[in-house]
Amino acid sequence: MPAYQVTGNEYVSLPAIREDTGAVQGLTVLHMGAKGLLELCGGDAPLIAPVVRVAGQEAMLAKLRWRRENAWVPVAQGEAQGLTVTLTYLCPLGERAFFVRLEAENRRDVPLEVWLGVRGQWTRTLHEVNETIALDGRRTQEASGWNNAFVMQEVAGLPLCAFAPIAEAGVKWTWGDMAFEGGDGVSLAPGGHACVELIFGVGVETVAAATSAKHLLRLGYERCLRQTLGWLKKRMLPAQDATVARMMNENLFFSFFFASGRTLDTEELCLMTSRSPRYYVSAAYWDRDSLLWSFPAIVLTDAAYAREILMHVFTRQIRNVGQHSRYIDGTLLEPGFELDELCAPVLALEGYLVRTGDPALLQEPCVKSGLSRILSVLETKRHPEIELYETFLQPTDDEIVYPYLTYDNALVWRVLLLLSEWLERPDLARRAGGVKAAVYRYCVREGQFVWSTDLEGHYDIYDEPPGSLQLLPYYGFCAMDDPVWQSTVRAIRSEAYPLSFAHRPIAEIGCRHAPHPWVLSICNSLLCGHADTALAHLARTRMDNGLACESVNEDTGECETGAAFATCAGFLAYALWSAAR
């Protein structure tokens, strides 16, 4: 499987830059009207590929070595017939456009005629929300005075999205049949340098795309690079170990830009599992994923953005809170109640208040009404006699065995305590005490916490990394020296537990949803007193080229499921930061 680099900003994502060639396979934009992602693809060829010619002959880029400037801007350096070539993809903050920059240095002792540029084609537009379908609309390509080149757009009755290049005057473009090539030639003396910067803009229609590119041209590459690197540096999290710092910050920015973004058509902030179509349920919203995993890292690094996220959750997403998954506009995608997802907005709000000390958010009308809605839904899930609450689906989104989950009710305990304080309702604190007592009475068997029970004598011993019993101390439900919790963790991490992968190179917990060690389990280990083993496991896996995936092979550490798992990347960054402290 090829390795990929990624980058992007709020509006544009480049989710699949091939490491072997440097080519962009496609780009994605969020579209509120389409309720998900639109991907512009090249089909059997890349959307954008770097091209180098020496003496009129195409020279293959070889031995590409990649780095991520300030943990996010991908830069490759390689060789091509006596040239050292550097390729950079830069998506400046807040812009609907990006740079492709090619630099060449002549390492030979004779002059070289060098041409630097790109080649590409837009032959398909894909709509992605969990599933992928190809649009059967009309794509157009025509000359434009806005960029002195051409513009391309997808038309579905009205324009849906558009794509346009621009460059300095020396760059020459050829185009036709939804394909294009553009670049510039120069004679390079020995030791000489050359550079070409090509800009691509996106928009709902052609004028927006062309002028978005033109705006970047006016700003200039160096200014945009300086501002972007400065923005990233300000938000990077510290760690003494350089390897941990790199992994933490690369996953932080991957989550920041791929688990949230702004729509091309309405410019609204929205949240999703991943803006990469390489993730198997991309471009849809889960309360759990966005608020329990991605959000803790965001609130560490950008309080204003975290506040905007919560306002989005308590407006766009609150109507269907607790339901399995939703479109980015808040309407229902997959039905099915999940108790941990109902709790997620409250827990995220707590994280924001603790980090920022900004109680004013609690006075926002949408937050007040949203908390009331969460409480009213919670009431409908309460057992008629016992202070425990049921769920329909588990934290993996799979069907339950029994309806009363220990982990879920630990979250309910926390939520009731918080709502008691925020809503000034002492009765909720008493109910929280009742939940804890009921968990210890009904959800403990053989000296350990069970996974779930029907309250009629049946229970199961199990664990799921997306909602692990290992996290009970993390949420404050019990202490790490609680003998019941310690017994539970020993049991699910022991060789006797079939999904523990104990004594394998990656000895982290899996589950039936994906029967391999989960990266979320590594996160859980970092947070529950097993940081040393978790860091050792991380050292043995590349995950998805250094970025979080769902699960990895227990022996090789290769990605098994869920590549480009952006919300998980946020939780990994947060867990690494917590462990580094």
At which residue positions do the language-model features occur?
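Terminal accessory carbohydrate-recognition/targeting modules of carbohydrate-active enzymes
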Residues: 1-239
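C-terminal capping/lid segments that line or modulate ligand- or cofactor-binding pockets
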Residues: 1-39, 282-285, 335-341, 345-355, ...
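The feature captures the catalytic groove of carbohydrate-active enzymes
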Residues: 195, 199-214, 279-280, 325-327, ...
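An acidic-aromatic substrate-binding cleft motif
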Residues: 214-274
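Long, well-ordered core segments of solenoidal/helical folds
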Residues: 251-263, 301-324, 366-387, 430-448, ...
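Aromatic-rich carbohydrate-recognition surfaces in CAZymes
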Residues: 280-384, 409, 563-581
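Extended ligand-binding clefts on enzyme/binding-domain cores
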Residues: 283-287, 373-376, 383-391, 402-411, ...
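Extended amphipathic alpha-helical segments enriched in small hydrophobics
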Residues: 405-436, 531-541, 569-580
